[in-house]
Amino acid sequence: MQQTKKLTQSDIIIAVMSGPFLQRGEPALISKWYRTKMALTNGVDLVVELPYAFATQKAETFANGAISILNALGVSEICFGSEDGQAENFYNTIAIQKNEEETFNRLVKQFMNAGNSYAKATSEAFLHILPPEKNVDMSQPNNILGLQYIKAILLQNSSMQAQTIKRFASHYHDETFHDQHIASATSIRKQLFNENSSSTTIEPFIPKMTASLLENYKQNYGTLHNWEKYFSFFKYKLMTMSSEDLQHIYEMEEGLEHRILSKIQNSSSFYSFMEALKTKRYTWTRLQRACTHILTNTTKEEIHKANIEQHAPYIRLLGMSQKGQTYLSRNKKKIELPILTHTKTFEHPTLDIERKSNAVYFSIMQEPLRTQLLKQDATHHPIRYDEITKKFL
């Protein structure tokens, strides 16, 4: 956050955040409301939600939804973390893909026919066309997403400029701590679910207020969220579904439904299920997203109605600082998308999916807490934070 402010010299910081389920195909560690508090206490002025229909997607669709929201809010610069750290290299890679489209597509097809995933095939294709020093390593997840952010900016004819901050020490998927002060999100999540680890283990790697809110969530709700918490629901659902039922689920490719139904039979945990399910063709993240759609019963028809090829249909405001509130007041007439401060009365196919995913997310809670949280999510107004006094209002 400090680097973003230094790099962009921004007046305000706006964060677009996924809701209950994430782009890598798993439940968020804690609710979006607690994550909003974390963002506000760490310098963000406006926190808005990226709907499930965009958030649990491949990088291209995820980026398209996020950029459309930021564009509507009048953002002048986007800043993202990447393994590369040079925005120019992203533009070079996009230019090569466009100028060498025929060669690029041929190479991607060639590498996929060799049994590689699309992400791996794309990475190899770029390396065959562009020298490594001018090319973005497309095997890295943050680089993949960063490239799609810039492509979305160009596609939407936005005047937004792109900046990127190089990730140091830990890569996105690193599972262990290699540095005294920097840790990957994956390693932090792993430590939080380690029975032999306490919350103090991760304190050197996250802001003090973030650690406090994390502990507060555990005390109030008795759990953190990961796939294992939902596995019994997931397995039960699959045991009651046929291959024909699964074919209606979004992102279910022909043949994958048979493999899923076969591997679930003898799986005693989500991890063991994924280990049995994965192949060279399907990445772990790609399979997790398919599993998320099974868990939430998100169908191809529902996503079609949500019309994800277009921009996000609304802006769900989750939280704001005093500065953020002032920005919205001054610019609300320029913002073409409806801004939702709650979802109780608004109707849209995208929001129908959102309501369902929230219900599933809270399903692991005990009653009456489960019902209370679900009701609150629809009526919850944006969290307000005074950045001067550092207090929630």
Swiss-Prot record:
Its EC number is 6.3.4.-. SUPFAM superfamilies: Nucleotidylyl transferase. One of its GO terms (biological process) is tRNA modification. It catalyses: cytidine(34) in elongator tRNA(Met) + acetate + ATP = N(4)-acetylcytidine(34) in elongator tRNA(Met) + AMP + diphosphate. It holds the Pfam family HIGH_NTase1. GO terms for molecular function: ATP binding; ligase activity, forming carbon-nitrogen bonds; tRNA binding. It comes from the Bacteria. The keyword RNA-binding applies. Keywords: ATP-binding, Cytoplasm, Ligase, Nucleotide-binding, RNA-binding, tRNA processing, tRNA-binding. GO terms for cellular component: cytoplasm. ATP binds at residues 81, 142, 167. Belongs to the TmcAL family. Catalyzes the formation of N(4)-acetylcytidine (ac(4)C) at the wobble position of elongator tRNA(Met), using acetate and ATP as substrates. First activates an acetate ion to form acetyladenylate (Ac-AMP) and then transfers the acetyl group to tRNA to form ac(4)C34. This is tRNA(Met) cytidine acetate ligase. The lineage of its organism: Bacteria, Bacillati, Bacillota, Bacilli, Bacillales.
